[in-house]
Amino acid sequence: MAPLRLSRANPLAFARWPVTLITAVVYLAFLIPLLIVHHVVPSPPTANPNGLDLTQAWADLQVLTDGFHPYNSRRNDEVHTWLLQRIHEILDAAPPADQYLSVDEEKPKPAVFVFDDTQSNLSFVGNSLSSSNTAVYFEGTNILVYIRGSDDDHENWWEEPNGVPSGKGGVLVNAHYDSVSTGYGATDDGVGVVTCLQLIQYFMTPGHAPRRGLVVLLNNGEEDYLNGARVYGQHPISKFPHTFLNLEGAGAGGRAILFRSSDTEVTRPYMSSKYPFGSVLAADGFATGLIGSQTDYVVFEVDLGLRGLDVAFMEPRARYHTEQDDSRHTSKSSLWHMLSAAVATTEGLVSDKSDQFEGAPTDDAKVASGSGSKAVWFDLFGTTFVLFELHTLFALSVTLLVVAPLALLVTGIALTRADKMYLFRTSAKADESLDSVPLQGLRGFFRFPFLFAIPTAVTVGLAYLVTKVNPLIIHSSEYAVWSMMLSAWTFLAWFVSRMADFARPTALHRIYTLTWMFVLAWVLLVISTVYQNQRGLAGSYSVFFFFSGTFLATWISYLELFSLPRKSEYANQNRPTSRRASSYGGSRLGTASGEDHEEDDHDAEEEEEEQEPTESTSLLGGGQRTTFANYVRVAGDHRDSDTDHHYYPGVYKHEQRWSASLPTWTWTLQFLLMAPLVLIMVGPLALLLTSALHQTGQDGSSSLFIYVAIAALTTFLLTPLLPFIHRHTYHLPVFLLLVFLGTLIYNLVAFPFSPTNRLKLFFIQDIDLSTGSTTASLAGVQPYVHAAASTLPSTANQNITCTEHTTRGTKCAWPGLAPRVVPDTPYSDWLDFTISQQHNTTDDKEGDEDTHHPRKARITLSGRNTRACKLLFDSPISSFAVLGSSTDPRFPTSSPHGTKEIRLWSREWENEWVVDVAWTTSTNDDSEEGDEGEGKLNGKAVCLWSDNNSAGVIPALDEVRQFAPSWVAVSKAADGLVEGWKGFSI
């Protein structure tokens, strides 16, 4: 083959090196900043902003997290006392009233009211619990701080019986100060708590006094089924706020993400955040059940009727609810990120003058906060926040679904009328001739399905392979998985396209590939639009931008065809004059069958005939003047070549001769219309999904989903390369092949855990208080949970029993070391309960066809050194009531499926609960067979111990922490670390 040279290198030409370099640079230019934004948290300012004290906030966090402080611990009471002390210190340090007026005459020093709520309690069952047959009685110890706004009612309306506020609603900011029994609670939710303390200080600073009143809620009991938020609804001040900001944590650092929001209007203040971070896709994850856990947000929005936002830390999940959720493993940068977002959002909400948060409630018992429009929101590189209404996206989607195909159709008609529609045309006839000139306009049309399907199928196959062989490798090596998927997809797409291009070269590869992509994107946008309209899911906004870029790129390809000669003109210029076969333009496999196979080329003498030199003749001889839009190739001397292949000026290798008229720089514009949009919109979603889910396999979630999701996102991210990848050189794809082979081997054989990415196992110890028999257990993923249990000294020469766990995979149990949660007390005295059966006074009517009648009993229960117990029933009870409990129509107290568990929480230690239960039995159960147990109610009385702040109190847990492998972390399996029980039968 004669060497191919460009007379002058065009840096934007549709040739191998420009395409390779430009596409690689663009992808790196966007992916690297996205990774930096995702993993690097902005540093806090060197000087404290007005009204804030970051040094004090960090010191407060260290005090708060110096011990485990679950609701059922003595340390929890100490934290409660310390918080009240800190609040009063902040309020006492507030400047005198005259300083406020000197800054803003309309905003005098606000009045502040601190409520230590030790009165509210509530019984409820069902709707937001993980199981609808679980009931709860809870006594709250919430702390509320109300900073009166300048526009608020100046009367203490909450002191009146059934008092209600007047005027506009206020703003609630919430964080919970309890931790889990196995975690120090630095991010869950210590950062949220110290942020609330800083907000109190900020809005007590002159110049920041609120217009709308601010209620800061530090609730206790979130970790045990959001109890504190529900009990907040029983306090009179809960009638006042209409909007809220919930601060939460599910990791140990990083950026605080906007998880979800109620509507566009309440989200708008978040736009003022200096470092916005998040996507509405996370909200869709909650709405569809993909994210199973919940925060206090659901209570405020669903149960109480407020409108608000949920801001939380989300990674790493391996440290969530473990002893590494401490101040050592978070940072001041993370604290500043949440604090800055909270200040900006809260200031926007309390400064609002409109009535957009007033209106009829969705339920008579809920707050009259009105309603807003569903929102679409996402950040751009952690610096800009994009927010618009969902119906705007819906309208744009519908418009584009109609306009885009019409635009291509009109363009196609115009091309046909101009006689320049080369697509799908195999030949063209010359004027006044029966002979036709081949156009090869169908070549490349069927290429895209293979280019798209083969790499996608292989990556999905890899997802299944890794799930089968080493499903938890993504726990510690998520980027090894991403590298495997990306490299495999890219190499296969390049290989398939190069093989197709070698066999049947065509200048129509780009336009046909874009046309297929347009159709695929159109179908995806139809599906996305349907979900937007029917289910209110906004997370598919990326599909709209993908379709927009694909449409414009496709349209440009169609417009390019106007630069071609008319087909009849081309046929006249290339009318056959001889009958010799040529390999030019044909298939490069087998016999020549291309453009010149059926046409007579110029005679050899005409081809070799030289033009007379002119002023514009190229100095390189036989060439043409270069233009920005076209290639200029200088062919070698074919007479000296060992092959009959020859290239025509402006034609890329063996592609159709008419393609010489196509511009060669427009591919750059097409690529820039697609790739950056996809990377900006889909890249953060891919990182968000990976961070949220790559360590959830340890919790019992399916590992396959995250692998398949990565495979799908890989396809989404790399699809913009398909129209251009056949022009890539071999260097990068071959390198990616090596990357693929290395990461594939690693992902299949590497151990999935490490000391920095530990496997979370869930501990609990059960003790039969009647016999003293105790069993310790770890729940988690096999075979790792058994391997961890086998390393413990107490399991040596012991039988470890492993059974299937309902939610955690496998539970391995062994005779554990005796707990000392109630020292110097016999096991039988750890829990006391009595049962008195209450007979139904209503006489059954003769001839009553109802074969069921209720039975009732009163159970009195108390535990030593605890304030948490529960009642478990083998069969559901129909109703329950706790003596002294409040009820609320917003929180049901019965379930249509009955109740099999009643959880009891008291603010007092060693409290005695009196519980009335009722259940129905068949009249047949009163027969003699009933004496054998058919009519009886069987169950257990259980008390919980969760205080793990002293070594030796729970030796079995201490043993796991000391002797388990370094790649193991311990978390709680239930509300109690130790659960002691006694059986009963009524």
Swiss-Prot record:
- Documented EC number(s): 3.4.-.-
Q: Which GO terms describe its cellular component?
A: vacuolar membrane
Which InterPro entries does the UniProt record give? Fxna-like_M28_dom, M28_fam, Peptidase_M28, PFF1_C, PFF1_TM
Q: Which residues lie on this side of the membrane: Cytoplasmic?
A: 1-16, 414-444, 497-510, 557-668, 726-732
Renumbered residue ranges of the record's region Disordered: 573-622, 840-859
- Chain positions carrying an annotated carbohydrate: 121, 799, 840, 948
Binding positions for Zn(2+) 2 per the UniProt entry = 188, 223, 321
> What highest taxon heads this organism's lineage?
Eukaryota
Q: Where does Zn(2+) 1 bind?
A: 176, 188, 248
Catalytic-site annotation from UniProt: 222 (proton acceptor)
The protein's required cofactor(s) are namely: Zn(2+)
UniProt cofactor note: Binds 2 Zn(2+) ions per subunit.
> Where do the TM regions start and end?
17-37, 393-413, 445-465, 476-496, 511-531, 536-556, 669-689, 705-725, 733-753
A single Gene Ontology MF term assigned here is:
metal ion binding
- Give the disulfide map: none
Q: Residues on the Vacuolar side?
A: 38-392, 466-475, 532-535, 690-704, 754-986
Question: What segments bear the compositional bias annotation Acidic residues?
Answer: 596-613
- What keywords does the record list, in alphabetical order? Glycoprotein, Hydrolase, Membrane, Metal-binding, Metalloprotease, Protease, Transmembrane, Transmembrane helix, Vacuole, Zinc
Quote the subcellular location field of this record.
Vacuole membrane
Q: Name one GO biological process term.
A: proteolysis
Stretches of Polar residues bias are at 573-585
Site (Transition state stabilizer) found at 320
Q: How does it sit in the membrane?
A: Multi-pass membrane protein
Job description of the protein: May be involved in vacuolar sorting and osmoregulation.
Q: Which family does it belong to?
A: Belongs to the peptidase M28 family.
Q: What is the official name of this protein in its record? A: Vacuolar membrane protease
